[in-house]
Design a protein with these regions (language model features):
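Patatin-like phospholipase
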Residues: 1-40, 48-303
Length: 303
């Protein structure tokens, strides 16, 4: 028997992570509370909050208070991120010269967003700073681009671990740790299922992949590179999701990770997706629990 019955893996996707909150609202209403949680990127943020206080309404209020605070670095950059403007920053950093594209971003530059914005957000959202202060077992996933390996954290500095998991390559400065260079967990584990697969009997994954890819029209060099990387990431995600016992995939409207102005709609779409699945999910959970109970009784029987 494994240490926990129910595990929950929360995928990464920036603003699309609002859908996690909607799913968790339905779970709480139906007394579905995981015993172990894993999170990548925004999934790590929400997972950490839930592991401290399993109250989705509280989580939503914390995000709303953060977004409405005009003094935050995040708030000052929000206008830049609306309407996909943020997504075009890299495209605007290319210059056409003699029918060729030359990237004119400085060779020493490793980020667009300062790590300070991530740290500020986490400091506001998380009342506790260490894993040991959480009430549900929790694992955070990041990626080491030196080795290509997943990095998993479950002890010590909670805020630092989540910040590493949120370091989107090319956008947020990576963390150097000895020889390691740590970036977003989504690079190696878009939805961190394998991270807790051996820790629980039944694993639910919430997938917030972008969904159907929009059509490209005369893509430039950078758009082709980005699309190729996105396709590779999606294939990795599809393979990974096969290891979950149950997958919920809310409609995230194909939104870019930076579209935080769509947060309320994404929360509602998470609710809708979970409500569609909840009856079947509860049935499967009941069957699995009954099976495990019978197995436990069988092996504990004195022959």
């Amino acid at each position: 028997m494994k240490n926990a019955f129910l595990g929950l893996a929360l995928g990464g996707g920036g603003a699309r992570g609002a859908a996690h909150i909607g799913v968790l609202k339905v779970f709480k209403e139906n007394q579905i509370i995981p015993e172990v949680i894993s999170g990548t990127s925004i999934g790590a943020v929400i997972g950490g909050m839930f592991a401290f206080k399993p109250d989705p309404d509280w989580i939503l209020r914390r995000f709303q208070d953060f977004f409405m605070n005009p003094k935050t670095l995040f708030h000052s950059s929000l206008d830049m991120m609306k309407n996909r403007n943020f997504e075009t920053l890299l495209e605007n950093s290319t210059k056409k010269i003699e029918n060729k594209f030359a990237v004119i971003i400085g060779p020493e530059r490793s980020q667009i967003i300062k790590r300070d914005i991530i740290d500020e957000m986490l400091d506001f959202l998380l009342p506790v700073k260490r894993f040991e202060e959480l009430n549900i077992r929790f694992k955070v996933v990041a990626s080491d681009i030196q080795t290509g390996n997943e990095e998993s954290y479950e002890k010590g500095d909670l805020v630092e671990a989540i910040a590493r998991s949120c370091s989107i390559p090319g956008y947020v400065k990576p963390t150097k740790d000895g020889d390691s260079i740590i970036v977003d967990g989504g690079v190696t584990s878009p939805t961190p299922i394998d991270t807790i697969r051996d820790d629980c009997e039944f694993l639910i994954a919430i997938n917030i992949d972008r969904g159907e890819l929009p059509k490209l029209k005369n893509p430039n060099m950078l758009e082709i590179i980005k699309r190729s990387d996105l396709i590779s990431n999606r294939r990795l995600s599809e393979l990974n999701l096969k290891n979950a016992d149950y997958v919920i995939s809310p409609d995230v409207l194909g939104l870019h990770w930076s579209e935080y102005n769509q947060f309320p709609l994404l929360v509602e779409n998470g609710v809708i997706a979970a409500e569609k699945e909840i009856s079947l999910l509860k049935e499967k959970l009941k069957k699995e629990a009954n099976f495990l109970y019978k197995m436990e009784k069988f092996f504990s029987f004195s022959w």
